[in-house]
Amino acid sequence: MRGTDTFTESLFTMRKLEDFVPARHPLREIRKTANAALDKLGPTLTAMYAAEVKGGRPSIAPEKLLRAMLLQVLFSVRSERQLMEQVHYNLLFRWFIGLSMDDAVWVPTVFTKNRERLIKHDAVIKFFNEVVDIAHKRDLLSGEHFSVDGTLIQAWAGHKSFVPKDDKPDADGGGAPAGDFKGQRRSNDTHESKSDGDARLYRKGNTASELRYMGHTLSDNRHGLIASAMVTQADGFAEREAAKAMISDARQALGDDEREMTLGADKGYDAKEFIDACMSMKVTPHVAQNTSGRKSAVPDEIAQTQGYATSQRKRKLIEQGFGWAKTVGGIRQVMVRGLERVDQMFVLTMAAYNLVRMRSLGQVRLQAAQ
């Protein structure tokens, strides 16, 4: 007998939100790990708000806010407005964030108002560090052998906004038309973006000059997990300076100044001052030798070792993080402005990448055990 096309909505349901999420859904393990990291941030998140004795209306739980920001990265949602629209009807999103089926959806400006608070208290950086610490406890990191690299991030600003620093529009609105820079010599010394003052006009290799930032990551060679991440203004020295800062932090985290550490990198890091800096930190520089019309700063006795060959093979894992961040995480062109905001978004994206990668590695171990 043919059924009738009718719809009768029940006024009550006896099912929990948890029941709608498949038992083997990837987000289950990701949420579990993210919550373990957030649990360690209690004092930091509490310090972000006024003491309870002062009264006032309770804020949106910062843990829920951070989980929502993770969702935006994991599912390539373009904007907070679109994210809130999807949370309204997506039960999976509600479950991950921690909203019940009846909870009201936030207005998108919640993210704008809380972003500065998260930056001020380094909440995203501390969350990233807790995720890395969990990976270390699961024996997913070597803690000794690393690779470093940088990538260009297109700023949320165009060429038309890149004008002379002393450029002031006429009272009558006259002057050169916006974006009419043909025949002009433009540089970061004389020009700046009115849309994003921290962005820099930069090109690398055969790429076109664009307003950009530069993202840097330090990856652990065991499984390619990101051990450190940061964003700087784009210039020719940023990669090496960021690498020195990140490997110095890794040395301090190791807690043993005499323990051997290695650092793999491409030819762009083959500079005497960088190699000397690594040596001074007792880090063996497994940097690709650049012998194009010059002598490499990397000693031949290092370049001929088996460890050097292994580092050169393993350093390619770092590209997986950049690839994921640009195709899934939306870092190819950021939708925020200012160095601090771009850095926050980049670090959060790398934390999300680690969560996804750790979940995959956990599945591999589980299958191997079976």
Question: In which residue ranges do the predicted regions lie?
Answer:
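Arg/Lys-rich, glycine/proline-spaced intrinsically disordered segments
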Residues: E52-R57, T291-V298, R365
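Charged, often Cys/His-bearing segments associated with DNA-binding zinc-finger transcription factors
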Residues: M1-A37, F181, M358-Q370
